[in-house]
Amino acid sequence: MLPGYMASATEIIAEGRQARAGGDLAAARSRYAAAAKIYRDRNDVLAYAHTIRHVADIYQQESNSGEAKPLYEESIELYRSNLNTKILDLANALRPYALLNEAQGNLELASKLWEEARQLYSSLRVQPGVFECDEHIRKLQQL
């Protein structure tokens, strides 16, 4: 890197992806968090929401639901409050939050999240997403 050069959020995310693929979750989380700060400082709400969702995913990989949960909640709230949100981004944020709630025994909330994600995936004809949601909804109905 050149002296005085500051990496862009996109470059930092690429570093995070590489670290995650290599199994260095702490470095990956750190890089995604650095990119999220850039997006937040620039008031790029949707990029920030997307990036903190990835930070939450990494926390989940590290079995740290306590850190993941508020990031998923913030990401979902930001997506829901922005008219430019892509439906797939919201669905992809609901999915891991549903998994987290299901694992924590918050079955009523998990069921609602799976239903909402299913509707969104269905509206986009993302069949793998619909099928996964259906599996979880069926499982939760049997409990």
For the regions a language model picked out, list residue spans one by one.
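Structural signature of alpha-solenoid helical repeat scaffolds
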Residues: 3-4, 43, 85, 125
